[in-house]
């Protein structure tokens, strides 16, 4: 195998001798770097001129063998073919290089990661198409090799990497916004999201783009169960083009306002009388700073002393100034309206900082974008001054959770070396702290009032005072008993591999980060996202991290069926608690029993004629409950009545889009695993999703097409029974049996109640 590998590498390197001998690298790569303005240069892995110049082939083969023995990397021979456009397939330039890729990387990301390793931009990688060739066979697309979304590079290329050539067709399209919506794919959407997340966080991006926050997180982290549908990709492409165009217009408006202010200062300077012979005076530094060419600013002898070589009428200058002011006012009003509609003011457009006109424009821009290293101390001082909690500050400053803010303050990462997502959060906090103190206090007060109103709307009693109907008691009891076992912390195996186990567990169970963080560590989705991003080395000295990872390790040590049951119970609990009205959550059990007794009395009055003495009817109320435990206890009947009000049957427009994408990708007959995945992703009960698919199958069979919902919410409770194409499943039969049994039970109770009434009357 090693001999064949060296022979193949020698053959391929001999074919690349022309490119290797060129110290500047392939011309296609140089043109691409100059066109996209990539700062990567040729210092990256894919730089032929910098990396392979003067390096013997035997040494490079030895390096590849060393990496292979470690078992983490695989060499892949790539041939990049550069086309002028996507229609005319005239190959202009091509070059070939080896790329080292991770074995555990997904196979469908091979093209993208190979181009990024070679130094190409995200937009170029998103628009590329790849073919794989084994030996001298005809090259085929990667999708023809396997359609498994979880297939890795090691699964597909472990045994044939030495005879495999990856041919990448790169079309010249300068920007993603210039790409037609029909050509958008799952890869282009993921790269566009990565580019957008450099300037904003996921929550603020989800408020603007047609994708939800959970879907954005899944696509970026490559945990989405399937590729985004073509319709969703086209919708995102249209939105991305409009978003970029609007952003460019705002940048142009800002630059126009800067130029108008500079022009106003220049006109005021030019209207001042200049003593002496101005034709002999050199241009002043102020004039040179406003002009691009010094010769233009030199006044001519035959002109008025205060004018430039190309005079501008004051009328035109005034018109430009008025137009700039109107545009600035319109921009400010639009931004104010957007801030009021978002409930979170300072995420997308930070408040403008007053710029001093005596500073150069480059310095002004840099001071606005830089984050001070004192930001962490500023936040602590602000928390002490205002007397607010970390949760309130995290919500109003950068719209995240208290757990994420606590982790940021604990680590105190240097802003100069911080990641893009952390920089976005730090910049948002810094922009918020630059507001006046009175404005910040007003925002804190508004947030407190909003929280109090939300709490009062839920009822006077806390949620924990409700009857113990929350299903995930198995999880809490199990973890609570394990928490008491203190000696387990010393023997527990906690190392850096726990982060990979967390990702594998979420992928296996098809659960979201929010659900896993809640059941495993009682944390938020933002906390888990930051934990997986930093992947800090576990150490008992870091007590907070060690305790959180210990909780996760205890949860992962549970048997797999028990973990799946906890996921299911927690998902159902979220549905149930979200669907119960506030007046039902906090009503005491005694009052509910009295209401049930009154309802049963009314039913008895409707079924049987009232007795001649109505004043004795209330005495029958207390006699009914003693007979109920013989069939069903009051707590069980109370639970049944609550379960009837809990289920959610409405499907939002966003969930409809995901379901329609699933129909286009998979079909109208999802299996149990797919239904469970959709239920967890859309936060909907399973029977709601089942009814939706049954209704769609009915319309396809009887009308020849799927039902058009016209972008409106759908309530599956409004579906008629004849509009559901379904088989008699066991769950449906059990439900019908329970319904018939409950009807018979009510009839028996009513008969017994009437018998008691007649007996009392006779007595």
Curated annotation (Swiss-Prot):
A motif (Nuclear localization signal) lies at residues 20-40. A motif (Protein interaction) lies at residues 139-143. Residues 266-296 have a biased composition (Polar residues). InterPro entries: CUT_dom, CUTL, HD, Homeodomain-like_sf, Lambda_DNA-bd_dom_sf, SATB1/SATB2, SATB_CUTL_sf, SATB_ULD_sf. DNA binds at residues 390, 400-410, 425. Changing residue 442 to N: Reduced MAR-DNA-binding. Expressed predominantly in thymus. Belongs to the CUT homeobox family. This is DNA-binding protein SATB1. It comes from Homo sapiens. The gene is SATB1.
């Amino acid at each position: 195998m090693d001999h064949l590998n060296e022979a193949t590498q020698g053959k391929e390197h001999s074919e690349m001798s022309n490119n290797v001998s060129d110290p500047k690298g392939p011309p296609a790569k140089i043109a691409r770097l100059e066109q996209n303005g990539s700062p990567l240069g040729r210092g990256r892995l894919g730089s032929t001129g910098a990396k392979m110049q003067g390096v013997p082939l035997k040494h490079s083969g030895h390096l590849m063998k060393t990496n292979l023995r470690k078992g983490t990397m695989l060499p892949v021979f790539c041939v990049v073919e550069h086309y002028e456009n996507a229609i005319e397939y005239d190959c202009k330039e091509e070059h070939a290089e080896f790329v080292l890729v991770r074995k555990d990387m997904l196979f469908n990301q091979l093209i993208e990661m190979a181009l990024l390793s070679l130094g190409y931009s995200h937009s170029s990688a998103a628009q590329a198409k790849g073919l794989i060739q084994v030996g001298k066979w005809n090259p085929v697309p990667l999708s023809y090799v396997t359609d498994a979304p979880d297939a890795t590079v090691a699964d597909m290329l472990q045994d044939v990497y030495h005879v495999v050539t990856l041919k990448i067709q790169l079309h010249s399209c300068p920007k993603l916004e210039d790409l037609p919506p029909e050509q958008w794919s799952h890869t282009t959407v993921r790269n566009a999201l990565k580019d957008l997340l450099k300037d904003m966080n996921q929550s603020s991006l989800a408020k603007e783009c047609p994708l939800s926050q959970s879907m954005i997180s899944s696509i970026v982290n490559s945990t989405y169960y399937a590729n985004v549908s073509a319709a969703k990709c086209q919708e995102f492409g249209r939105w991305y083009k409009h978003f970029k165009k609007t952003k460019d217009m705002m940048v142009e408006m800002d630059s126009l306002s800067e130029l108008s202010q500079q022009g106003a200062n220049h006109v005021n300077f030019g209207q001042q009388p200049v003593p002496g012979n101005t034709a002999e005076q050199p241009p002043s530094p102020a004039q040179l700073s406003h002009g691009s060419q010094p010769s233009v600013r030199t006044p001519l002898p035959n002109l008025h002393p205060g004018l430039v070589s190309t005079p501008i009428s004051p009328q035109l200058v005034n018109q430009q100034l008025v137009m700039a002011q109107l545009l600035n006012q319109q921009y400010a009003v639009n931004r104010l309206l957007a801030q009021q509609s978002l409930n979170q003011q300072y995420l997308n457009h930070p408040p403008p900082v007053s710029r001093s006109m005596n500073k150069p424009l480059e310095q002004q821009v840099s001071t606005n974008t830089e984050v001070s290293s004192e930001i962490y101390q500023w936040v602590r001082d602000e928390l002490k001054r205002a007397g607010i909690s970390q949760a309130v500050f995290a919500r109003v400053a950068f719209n995240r959770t208290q757990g994420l803010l606590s982790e940021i303050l604990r680590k105190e990462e240097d802003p100069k070396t911080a990641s893009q997502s952390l920089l976005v959060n730090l910049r948002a906090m810094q922009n918020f702290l630059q507001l006046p103190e009175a404005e910040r206090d007003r925002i804190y007060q508004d947030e407190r009032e909003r929280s109090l109103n939300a709490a009062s709307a839920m009822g006077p009693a806390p949620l924990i005072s409700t009857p113990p109907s929350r299903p995930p008691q198995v999880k809490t009891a199990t973890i609570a008993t394990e928490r008491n076992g203190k000696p387990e912390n010393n023997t527990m195996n906690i190392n850096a591999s726990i982060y990979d186990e967390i990702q594998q567990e979420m992928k296996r169970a098809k659960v979201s980060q929010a659900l896993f963080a809640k059941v495993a560590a009682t944390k938020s989705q933002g906390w888990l996202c930051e934990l997986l991003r930093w992947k800090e080395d576990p150490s008992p000295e870091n007590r907070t991290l060690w305790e959180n990872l210990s909780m996760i390790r205890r949860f992962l040590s549970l048997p797999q069926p028990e973990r799946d049951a906890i996921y299911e119970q927690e998902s159902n609990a979220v549905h149930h608690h979200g669907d119960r009205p506030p007046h039902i959550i906090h009503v005491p059990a005694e009052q509910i029993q009295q209401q049930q007794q009154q309802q049963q009395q009314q039913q008895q009055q409707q079924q049987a004629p009232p007795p001649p003495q109505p004043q004795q009817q209330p005495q029958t109320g207390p006699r009914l409950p003693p007979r109920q435990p013989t069939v069903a206890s009051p707590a069980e009947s109370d639970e049944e009545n609550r379960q009837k009000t809990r289920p959610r049957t409405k499907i939002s427009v966003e969930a409809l889009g995901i379901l329609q994408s699933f129909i286009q990708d998979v079909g109208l007959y999802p299996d149990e695993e797919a239904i469970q995945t959709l239920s967890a992703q859309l936060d909907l009960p399973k029977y709601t999703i089942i009814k939706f698919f049954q209704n769609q199958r009915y319309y396809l069979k009887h009308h020849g097409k799927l039902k058009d919902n016209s972008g409106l919410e759908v309530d599956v409770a409004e579906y008629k029974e004849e509009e559901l194409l379904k088989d008699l499943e066991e769950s449906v039969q059990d439900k019908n049996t329970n319904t018939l049994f409950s009807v018979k039970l009510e009839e028996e109770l009513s008969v017994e109640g009437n018998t008691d009434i007649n007996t009392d009357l006779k007595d």
